A protein has these predicted regions:
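Canonical Radical SAM [4Fe-4S] cluster-binding loop centered on the CxxxCxxC motif
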Residues: 28-68
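N-terminal [4Fe-4S]-dependent radical SAM core
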Residues: 1-40, 250-252
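Cysteine/selenocysteine-centered motifs that mediate thiol-based redox chemistry or coordinate metal-sulfur cofactors
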Residues: 300-309
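Short amphipathic alpha-helix with an adjacent loop that forms part of the alpha/beta core around
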Residues: 73-75, 122-129, 172-173
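Core AdoMet radical
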Residues: 38, 57-67, 79-92, 102-121, ...
């Protein structure tokens, strides 16, 4: 274990840099943050995959964000977790320099890439991990692949990302029992994701797959198909995860509301460096994305106060 520690509001945060495990601790019965612990940060809208469910409408000629000029990033506290994505973040011409600067400031950088790009750029990504420029690698599932399993097994902090509604049980079964970690994301009805969902045949398929996964998820967890099974807040809601956990388990594992249903108690947010906007999460519609401010505390408190009104 390789824990780092800092204080956020009325509690202490402990992060194991080796496993990615995070622990919040205080002697009270509630956590009150005063800044972000983690941030989804979109650095480019460029991607050649053309995924029909893409909630960012990324395209091959999508713009890159300015990630090197002075900004709020210069004032983030050490050990802030950055989940770097896009688009395809590997396309950004300044990503190497950006990661070096983040390491100097002791940020914990994780990167999310499509399965195809992960396999094609494995050596580059593995080098980032070996040099502690990147700690975690999220791999967005595309199709079942023995090659994918083989490469992910060489990066202990790699996590398979799948989308409820698009992932099928047979695909999960293929990837299971290979010492992998998995993150299940909720289906986002945003931009192309909304268009896809509104297609009648896809609408029925997505709902069927969500219903199927909701039924089998307790067995997937109990039978240890994956070393770690985690969820974003949207998947927690769509799959009714709270219903399969005891109250003690829920209180132990749940990291807080992200503002989808009003209240925001999590210490996270979304930043679009391409459009220079921030929001409570990446599900936020255009009218709930706001112009970047000079420091992250102001942005976090703006979102927190707005969502708690």
């Amino acid at each position: 274990m390789n824990f780092v520690q800092y204080k956020n509001g009325n509690y202490d945060v402990f992060i194991d840099l080796d496993s990615g495990t995070k622990i919040r601790k205080n002697d009270l019965d509630f956590f009150e943050a005063n800044t972000v612990e983690s941030m989804d940060i979109k650095i480019t809208n460029c991607c050649n995959m053309g995924c029909p469910m893409c909630h960012e409408n990324s395209t091959p000629d999508g713009k890159h964000g300015d990630i090197l000029s002075p900004s709020f990033l210069d004032n983030l506290h050490p050990y802030t977790e950055l989940a770097i994505g896009g688009g395809n973040p590997l396309e950004h011409p300044n990503i190497d320099e950006f990661l070096k600067r983040c390491k100097e400031r002791k940020f914990i950088c994780n990167i999310t890439v499509n399965q195809k790009h992960f396999i094609e750029n494995y050596n580059k990504i593995k080098n980032w991990v070996d040099n502690k420029l990147v700690y975690g690698v999220g791999v967005s599932f595309y199709r079942t692949s023995n090659k994918l399993i083989e490469l992910m097994q060489t990066i202990p902090n790699s996590v398979l990302h799948v989308i409820a509604g698009l992932i099928e049980l047979n695909d999960l079964n293929f990837m299971a029992n290979n010492n992998l970690k998995i993150l299940i994301l909720g289906y986002k009805q945003v931009r192309r994701g909304k268009d896809l969902y509104n297609n009648y045949s896809m609408h029925n398929m997505i709902n069927y797959n969500i219903d199927t996964l909701r039924y089998y998820i307790k067995h997937i967890i109990k039978d240890k198909w994956f070393n770690v099974v985690s969820f974003d807040n949207l998947a927690i809601k769509q799959l009714d995860i709270k219903n399969i956990l005891s109250e003690d388990q829920w209180n132990e594992f749940y990291m807080g509301d992200d503002g989808q249903d009003g209240e925001q108690t999590s210490a996270s947010m979304f930043v679009d460096m391409v459009e220079r906007k921030f929001a409570k999460n990446s599900c936020a519609p255009e009218d709930e994305r706001y112009d970047l401010l000079d420091n992250v505390e102001d942005m976090y408190n703006f979102l927190k106060n707005r969502n708690n009104e």
